[in-house]
């Protein structure tokens, strides 16, 4: 695959891609199976130190919908979060007619990244049922990943949102040392 992004300054970037899809099954078991397959595949190609970072689109999306901001403002917040500019997010939310609890959840987003314990903290601060359900699904996936023996390779990041509305459920990215980008991306 050849990709020509504007950030590549006119140079083409060649990459090799492998795809896997599980079609027709919308279950936590299917999500866990796909992530376990990623872990197994990375181990089989010889990687020993890597992390698969998992999030759920519904967590952040439900927060966005609750802000009352316009689509353009929401898109700006998504971009700020993708660039880890949480101060910019706070500034934009000052303009929003959002509850103090919702603003606090946005402020805590950087803390909702890490091991499984962040999910327990996130569910306590989730201001919507949709956000709570997203965290609950991630907890179920984690328990299944433990059965696969893949839990040591998994972290969570509830600020992950996928790209341009393409994903509607879990999203994941795998990282290892020596690369600046994710070596695996995917989701539902």
Give the positions of each predicted feature.
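Active-site-adjacent beta-strand anchor residues
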Residues: 53-54, 157
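Positively charged, Gly/Ser-enriched RNA/tRNA-binding surfaces
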Residues: 1-48, 92-188
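Short secondary-structure capping/junction motifs at helix and strand boundaries
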Residues: 46-52, 72-75
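Hydrophobic mid-domain F-helix/FG-region of cytochrome P450s
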Residues: 37-43, 58-66
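Acidic, His- and aromatic-enriched active-site or binding-groove loops in soluble protein domains
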Residues: 68-91, 98, 176
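Short, conserved phosphate-binding/catalytic loop or strand-edge motifs used
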Residues: 13-18, 54-62
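Short glycine/threonine-rich loop-to-helix capping motif typified by GTGT followed
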Residues: 61-71, 165-172
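Short, solvent-exposed helix-helix connector turns and helix-capping sites enriched
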Residues: 56, 84-85, 115
């Amino acid at each position: 695959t050849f990709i020509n992004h504007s950030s590549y300054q006119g140079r083409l970037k060649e990459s090799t891609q492998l795809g896997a899809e599980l079609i027709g099954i919308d279950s936590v078991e299917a999500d866990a199976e796909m992530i376990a397959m990623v872990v197994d595949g990375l181990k089989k190609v010889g990687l020993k130190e890597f992390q698969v970072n998992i999030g759920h689109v519904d967590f952040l999306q439900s927060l966005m919908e609750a802000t009352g901001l316009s689509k353009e403002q929401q898109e700006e917040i998504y971009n700020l979060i993708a660039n880890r500019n949480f101060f910019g997010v706070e500034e934009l939310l000052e303009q929003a007619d959002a509850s103090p609890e919702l603003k606090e959840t946005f402020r805590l987003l950087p803390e909702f990244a890490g091991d499984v314990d962040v999910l327990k903290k996130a569910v306590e601060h989730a201001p919507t049922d949709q956000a709570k359900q997203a965290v609950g699904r991630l907890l179920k996936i984690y328990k299944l990943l433990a059965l696969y023996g893949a839990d040591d390779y998994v972290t969570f990041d509830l600020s992950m949102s996928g790209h341009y509305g393409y994903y509607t459920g879990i999203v994941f990215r795998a990282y290892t040392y020596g690369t600046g980008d994710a070596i695996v991306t995917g989701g539902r």
